[in-house]
Amino acid sequence: NAWSQHFKAVDGYENVRVENGYLKLRACKDNGIYKNGGVFSKIGFPCDTRLEVKARLTGLVRGGFPAIWQMPIGAPEWPRGGEIDLMEWVQGTPMQIYQTVHTYYINGESGSAGVTNKNPDKNFDVTEDHIYAVERTEKELVFYVDGKETWRYENQYLDKEKLQYPFCEYTFNIILNFSLGGDL
């Protein structure tokens, strides 16, 4: 996918660690090179799955771009297999989170913007613990924050259904990452 082509695995865990039972991700700029922290599951989760992640930011970092998201395993090039963003945060809107869906039907060949639900609460404090969740079924994706439904992306059962709703064609892994260097 477009995201992974810009990153490479490195030896060591300088930006990923477990401390007091919590996974901690960090990012830094080292000699002009951005080093991001992230983890992903090697196995995928099937359709009819609810995924929940409890997370918080320890600070609002300029250029920071944390995300909790899912990508299909074994799908053709992005965005044909879809992408599910349970939570993204950008410095340009520090008191909001974004939940986004990407598909070929939405994005086309080269577009990057998906269908996004901006959390309507303009005073959302990302430095507090929150539970971000998505339920993935044949019918729809249902997004939640702290147990409250935030929005739905429905399968429209179009002739080109796999382009509009590919979310049950593949298993999806989970990715947790904290990137640095964005200007959003």
Predicted regions and their residues:
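GH16 jelly-roll
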Residues: 1-184
